[in-house]
C-alpha cells in the first residue's frame, strides 16, 4: 500500500517541493478460531509488521509455514475485524477460522514465533499488548547539517552497506555527526 506525500527534496544543490511515493507498514494481529474437544475457541497467535494489501495471503503462508495447517482447505474463513485505525483507516486484526475437521491442541502449536523488527512490534501476542505512543519533537534550532553533508551521506552509506547493492534486501540507516562523519 503506497501513498503520495508532499516532501522537500534536495536536488542539484537546491531544495524543491515534490511528491514522494511512500510504502506504509502497520502491525497485524493474527488470531485463530479452532475446535478443541468439540468446543470452538479463539486465540491470538502473533503480531507481525506488514505492508497492508495482501493480508490474507500473508496469513495463509504463515499458518502453512508454521505447520498449523497442512492444506489450504483446512481454512474455513479469513476475515479482518476490529476498528479501522490510524491515518489510513485500516483494520489491523485478522481472525482465521479453521474448518471443523481440524481439531487443534493450541498448547502444541503456540510458541514464541520468530517475527522481529527493530521497532519492537513483531513478536507481541496481541495489539492490546502493544502500546504505541507518538511524541512529536519540535526542533528549537535550524538543522545543523550543511547541504554538502546531506548530499554526500547517501554515497557514504552505500559504501558502508555493500550487501544492499547485491541483494536489494538488506538496508540500514546511518548516524552522522554535524561535520559529516559517519558515527554508526
Residue positions per predicted region:
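Intrinsically disordered, low-complexity regions enriched in acidic/Ser/Thr/Pro/Gln residues
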Residues: 1-173, 178, 183-184
Amino acid at each position: 500500500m503506497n501513498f503520495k506525500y508532499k516532501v522537500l527534496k534536495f536536488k542539484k544543490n537546491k531544495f524543491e517541493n515534490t511528491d514522494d511515493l511512500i510504502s506504509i507498514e502497520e502491525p497485524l494481529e493474527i488470531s485463530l478460531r479452532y475446535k478443541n474437544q468439540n468446543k470452538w475457541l479463539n486465540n491470538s497467535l502473533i503480531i507481525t509488521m506488514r505492508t497492508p494489501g495482501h493480508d490474507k495471503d500473508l496469513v495463509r503462508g504463515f499458518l502453512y509455514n508454521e505447520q498449523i495447517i497442512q492444506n489450504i482447505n483446512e481454512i474455513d474463513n479469513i476475515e479482518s475485524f476490529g476498528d479501522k485505525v490510524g491515518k489510513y483507516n485500516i483494520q489491523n486484526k485478522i481472525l482465521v477460522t479453521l474448518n471443523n475437521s481440524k481439531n487443534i491442541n493450541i498448547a502444541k502449536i503456540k510458541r514464541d514465533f520468530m517475527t522481529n523488527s527493530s521497532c519492537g512490534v513483531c513478536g507481541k501476542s496481541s495489539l492490546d499488548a502493544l502500546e504505541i505512543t507518538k511524541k512529536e519533537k519540535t526542533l528549537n534550532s535550524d538543522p545543523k547539517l550543511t547541504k554538502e553533508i546531506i548530499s554526500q551521506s547517501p554515497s557514504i552509506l552505500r559504501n558502508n552497506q555493500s550487501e544492499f547493492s547485491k541483494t536489494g534486501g538488506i538496508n540500514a540507516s546511518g548516524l552522522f555527526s554535524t561535520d559529516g562523519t559517519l558515527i554508526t
